[in-house]
């Protein structure tokens, strides 16, 4: 089975198009060659009817993945203009002299800025017809027309100066000039709709109508499933759990690992409705009010649209939110993001955001499933839950929304350009919601209280004051971080006896709320009530589509390979796979033999031993004369 990197296909396409552009062929021949190159790329991925028929269809990527890979290819040409763009813009500026200055300025702009300015001009020209109708109802030059004209100027800010001039003494000349703007602008709008800005290849890297219909039907099916399988969140439990996270001391998080970032990263997303990449990297937040921030850096937008700021709600104090975002981004586990976004080489065609998301989703999603107690839940669910909470909390009471419906509310707070996209963010409902609910920040430290009940037993627990000292140390640790897990490694730096530590942990296990798990290590008892309320009918996990606007990014496509050919036998792609198979075979021959890791000498006469047996992991720490004796003691501790 031969596999080809999608990056190789895209780089091959780019090289071929560049060679065509650099050739001395007539432009008509270049266009034909470019179209053929785009067709070859599409056939390799999806459209080759000879390759993808019969059983070959099983190896073909989905239409949605095809669309995402097409987007990757298109992005490589984003900064290139159409070969006739300059010539056509010059013609337009000569044909429409009243708009010549605006059109001519495009010739010195990069492609992204041209698209932005063109979009603004088109939006302005689309206002000509309604503006002309409104003006026809005003008798310009009369005494009572001034107020009406000022009101109209405020209604159409892009035309404000031209409209305001109608209140001047030479209003007739200004009116005639405005009508000329209307006349030329109406024709210009039609010509702009036919103006090709992008490189020629982009017009051939498009989905067919059948492919687009297939994708749209899948989105419709996903939406239908969501609407008929809502998820109920217990609002007080969910928010209390989120507040418990953000109220912890920052030192209580293990921010040296990606998995250690998960609790704080999810909590910040839950409180703001922002995407993972917006929280971790590209979002810019500044305090705008007690529970509002100004947000810049919306993901899944063209580069020219990312400079638009939005005012969004935070479900906690905005100052605390911004502070925690900065703390999270400056932690050691996020220090290598600049390297990650560079990718693994020229054939890594994922977006920078996609590269970050690939490593973080793997680290964060397992924690989210545990936190919510539901294997169907993932990090991005925080966005939809936030939208529902924000709607219940603010929509009916904030004057900002008095003239709009709920669809506009969801669109605005989520940053969508399309009112239909927000329909996918209504899968969650809230149970026990109350606008007057407040988090319990003064809750008694139950573990500390339970430990304090053991105080009277400590003087006789060990020789001298050893029992009292280890007990006081544990109480201090639990007071600083109520959720800390106390283990051998936690107490070893305090130089307590290696025999005393496991004895104390066993004695205080109930007070600490800990137990020895299947892996032989201490675990915290999770007695928190369920956040996701049980369904009457358990749903199977749904292969969801991340639908954010019409610009679908490739963040979820972590696999950079596709199968482009078939063979009868299966081959191992790397030698490492063969080695793993050999190890597995040996393990099958000797199922009863424990697998020890090399014992770790702690330097104080004690050893740390870990081993696996019967599919379970075991750990032991204690005094021993040598490594062999340590391994024997570890085995005896569990299997006498």
From Swiss-Prot:
- Record Gene3D superfamilies: 1.10.10.2040, 1.10.287.3180, 1.20.1440.270, Telomere resolvase (1.10.443.30)
Q: Where does DNA bind?
A: 275, 300, 383, 416
Q: What is its EC number?
A: 3.1.22.-
The alphabetical list of record keywords is: DNA replication, DNA-binding, Endonuclease, Hydrolase, Nuclease, Viral DNA replication
- Has keyword Nuclease? yes
Q: What does this protein do?
A: Converts the circular intermediates produced by the viral replication and carrying a joined telomere site to a linear DNA molecule with covalently closed hairpin ends. The viral circular DNA is cleaved at a palindromic site called telRL thereby generating a linear prophage plasmid with telomeres. Binds covalently to the 3'-phosphoryl of the cleaved strands.
So where's the catalytic machinery, residue-wise?
Answer: 425 (nucleophile)
From the Swiss-Prot or TrEMBL record, give the protein name: Protelomerase
**Which family, according to the similarity comment?**
Belongs to the Caudoviricetes Protelomerase family.
Q: Which Pfam families does UniProt cross-reference here?
A: ResT-TelK_cat, TelK_muzzle, TelK_N, TelK_stirrup
Q: Give the UniProt record's GO annotations in the biological process aspect.
A: DNA replication; viral DNA genome replication
Domain of life, source organism: Viruses
Compositional bias segments (type: Acidic residues): 545-585
Assembly, in brief, is: Monomer. Homodimer; in presence of DNA.
Q: InterPro entries from the xrefs?
A: ResT/TelK_cat (IPR032047), ResT/TelK_cat_sf (IPR038280), TelK_muzzle (IPR049460), TelK_N (IPR055040), TelK_stirrup (IPR049454)
């Amino acid at each position: 089975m031969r596999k080809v990197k999608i990056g190789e296909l895209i780089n091959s396409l780019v090289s071929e198009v560049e060679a065509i552009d650099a050739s001395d062929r007539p432009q008509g021949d270049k266009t034909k060659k470019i179209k053929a190159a785009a067709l070859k790329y599409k056939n390799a991925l999806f459209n080759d009817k000879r390759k993808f028929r019969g059983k070959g269809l099983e190896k073909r990527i989905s239409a949605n993945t095809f669309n995402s890979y097409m987007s990757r290819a298109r992005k490589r040409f984003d900064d290139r203009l159409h070969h006739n763009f300059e010539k056509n813009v010059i013609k337009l500026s000569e044909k429409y002299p009243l708009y010549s200055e605006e059109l001519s300025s495009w010739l010195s702009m990069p492609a992204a800025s041209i698209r932005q300015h063109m979009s603004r001009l088109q939006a302005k020209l689309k206002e000509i017809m309604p503006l002309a109708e409104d003006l026809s109802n005003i008798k310009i030059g009369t005494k009572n027309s001034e107020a009406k004209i000022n009101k109209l100027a405020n209604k159409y800010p892009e035309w404000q100066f031209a409209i305001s001039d109608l209140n001047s003494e030479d209003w007739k000349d200004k009116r005639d000039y405005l009508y000329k703007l209307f006349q030329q602008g109406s024709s210009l709008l039609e010509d702009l709709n036919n103006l090709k800005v992008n490189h020629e290849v982009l017009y051939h890297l498009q989905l067919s109508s059948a492919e687009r219909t297939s994708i749209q039907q899948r989105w419709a099916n996903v939406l239908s499933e969501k609407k008929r399988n809502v998820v109920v969140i217990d609002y007080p439990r969910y928010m209390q759990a989120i507040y418990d996270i953000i109220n912890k001391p920052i030192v209580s998080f293990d921010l040296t690992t990606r998995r250690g970032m998960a609790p704080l990263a999810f909590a910040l997303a839950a409180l703001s409705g922002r995407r993972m990449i917006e929280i971790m990297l590209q979002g810019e937040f500044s305090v705008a009010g007690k529970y509002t921030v100004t947000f810049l850096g919306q993901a899944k937008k063209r580069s020219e649209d990312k400079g638009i700021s939005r005012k969004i709600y935070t479900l906690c104090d905005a100052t605390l939110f911004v502070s925690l975002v900065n703390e999270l981004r400056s932690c050691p586990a996020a220090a290598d993001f600049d390297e990650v976004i560079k990718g693994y080489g020229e054939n890594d065609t994922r977006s920078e955001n996609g590269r970050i998301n690939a490593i973080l989703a793997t680290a964060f999603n397992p924690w989210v499933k545990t936190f919510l107690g539901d294997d169907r839940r993932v990090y991005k669910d925080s966005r939809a839950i936030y939208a529902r909470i924000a709607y219940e909390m603010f929509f009916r009471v904030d004057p900002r929304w008095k003239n709009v419906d709920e669809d506009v509310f969801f669109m605005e707070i989520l940053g969508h350009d399309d009112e239909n996209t927000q329909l996918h963010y209504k899968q969650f409902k809230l149970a026990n919601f109350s606008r007057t609910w407040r988090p319990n920040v003064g809750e008694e430290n139950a573990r500390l209280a339970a430990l304090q009940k053991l105080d009277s037993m400590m003087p006789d627990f060990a020789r001298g004051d050893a029992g009292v000292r280890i007990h006081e140390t544990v109480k201090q640790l639990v007071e600083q971080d109520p959720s800390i897990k106390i283990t051998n490694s936690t107490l070893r730096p305090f130089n307590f006896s290696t025999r005393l530590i496991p004895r104390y942990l066993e004695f205080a296990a109930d007070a600490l709320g800990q137990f020895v798990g299947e892996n032989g290590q201490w675990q915290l008892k999770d007695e928190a009530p369920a956040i996701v309320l049980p369904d009457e009918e358990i749903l199977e996990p749904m292969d969801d589509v991340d639908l954010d606007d019409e610009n679908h990014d490739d963040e979820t496509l972590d696999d950079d390979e596709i199968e482009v050919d078939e063979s009868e036998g299966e081959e191992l792609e790397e030698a490492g796979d063969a080695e793993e198979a050999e190890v597995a075979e040996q393990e099958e021959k000797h199922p009863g033999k424990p697998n020890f890791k090399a014992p770790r000498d702690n330097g104080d006469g004690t050893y740390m031993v870990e081993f696996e047996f019967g599919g379970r992991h075991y750990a032991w720490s204690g005094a021993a004369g040598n490594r062999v004796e340590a391994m024997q003691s570890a085995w005896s501790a569990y299997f006498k």
